Each structure stands twice: as structure tokens, then as C-alpha cells.
Amino acid sequence: MQPLRPSPAAGGWAGVAGVGPTTVDEASMERSKSFVKALQELKNLRPQLYSASEYCEKSYLHSEQKQMVLENLKDYAVRAVVNAVDHLGTVAYKLTDLFEQQASEVSTVELKVARLNQQILTCQIFTDRAGLRQQKIGGTTFKHHKHYILPSTGHKRTQAARLQTDNGQDSKPKPYPSAKTLSWHLSSENSISTTGAQKYTFTLGDTISSKPASNGSMYLLGKDIPASPMHKPLQPNGNTSFDAKKNVGSKDQPGFMHMSTFNALDKPRGREIQKVPVSTKSMLATLFIKHKSAKTRKASVR
């Protein structure tokens, strides 16, 4: 139930249950009607006051008790003024109520408009950001040249993420062999340089060397080639000598000659610098005899 409230226009009680307004439009309509009614009552005071003044004037002229007529006129004038002020207050109250109602409606509409503007602005900002993000996917345009731009942390993170993804893809088995890198080629060249000395083939005249034996000796195909004068320019003393050791436990085959090592080709006497042999046993290490063995052989000859 709605609480009872006095009506300043009618001076009675209104708003009884079932009589009051049910919607906002009906309430505003009733307020407008009450304001118009109060304004009309204020306008009706003018003819009433004119008729009261004429009556007082006639009664004062034709009556013998003029003093009594004056007192009644004073009381009527006071009541008329009070009634006029009351009507003015009612009209002012109705006007203020109507103005407040209109102001509240205007403020509500402004609030709704502001909310719609905020929603539109939010949608526009989101659309701009989404559009910029999509445009940046195609390619970023730098303000300065690339040489003068320091790499940002975000760029480093993206590079690190790409490297991680590449490593993850490389870790998976591939159906086809991967391309050889520069480090692989360098390591293969080094391995060939260290082990390639054991795979040399020598051609002496019509002879072709075969694969080296397990103990470092070399088998030469063909006839025995004696020392010829063509080898003398290679020797500083003019002597060419080959010391061949027989391979222990191996059988002599026809057409093959066992040669384990070559002598130092009569190196010149004097102090020589001995190079440190390579860690891996190669054919060059088996071809040359250490200088110490040459000294012991010379001592035995003496």
C-alpha cells in the first residue's frame, strides 16, 4: 500500500491504494494536471475580488451602519489575500515539482546518452587496437633505419622463441638427411688430414701400391726397382739407401716386395730438430726412422 499524502491543490487526501499512479507517464500527467488546475484557480481570484469590492462599495453607500460594513470588508480582504497567497504557493509548488520531474528526466536521458557514448568509445578503441594488431602482423614499419635501431626485448624474446621452435623441430627425426653445416665440413677435413696419410698410394714406374698392412709395412707390386741416378739429385751426399725389414710371420708372395720403412735418405750430419710425431700413427711415421737408431747403427760400424 502507498502511504497517504495530502494534496495541496484540493486540500484533502489522495494516493489511496488503487487510486495512485502506476507508471511514470501517468504520474507526470497527474502533476501537469494539478499544476494547470492550481494556475486556473489563481486566475479565478481576480473576478471574485472585483465582485467583492463592488459589493462592499454598494453596501457602504446604502447602509446606515457603515462601521460594521468596514469591519466586514477588512475581514474579507484579509481572507482574500490569504487565499491568493495560498493559491500562489500551490502554483509555485506544482511548478517546482514539475520542473524537478523534467530535470530528473533530462538527467536520466543525459546519463543514458553518456553511457552510450562510453560504450561507443570503448568499441572504437577496441576496434582500433585490433586493426592495428592485424596491420602489424603483415610487417612493421620503422621510423629510423635498421642500423640505428637497437634490438628491443620483445624482438629478442621472439628470436629466442623461434630458436626454441627450430631446435624442437630439429630434435624430431626427419625422413630426409639434413644439410651439412660449415662446422661439419671443417671437422671432416681435419679428420681426413689426420687419417688420410694412411691411404696414400705410391706409383714407382709400373708398380702400384696396395693398402698398407696392419704393422705399417707396404707391399709394392711389380719388379724390384734398383736405385737409379735419377734419385741422386734428391740426396745431398749422392747416396741412396733403403732399409727394408722383413715382416715377421708373413709369407713372401711372388711379385710383391715387403718394405717396412725407408731410411732417412742419408740426412746431412749435424744437429737436427726432431719434430714431435702426430698422436695418430700415420704412414709418414712408419716411413722415417728416428735419428737415435741411425746413431746406434753408426756406432756399431765403427
Swiss-Prot record:
The keyword Transcription regulation does not apply. Its main location: cytoplasm. Residues 151-179, 220-256 are annotated as: Disordered. The keyword Zinc-finger does not apply. Keywords: Cytoplasm, Cytoskeleton. Residues 161-170 have a biased composition (Polar residues). InterPro entries: ABI. It comes from the Eukaryota. It is found in: Cytoplasm, Cytoskeleton. GO terms for cellular component: cytoplasm; cytoskeleton. Involved in regulation of actin and microtubule organization. Part of a WAVE complex that activates the Arp2/3 complex. Belongs to the ABI family. Binds SCAR. This is Probable protein ABIL4.
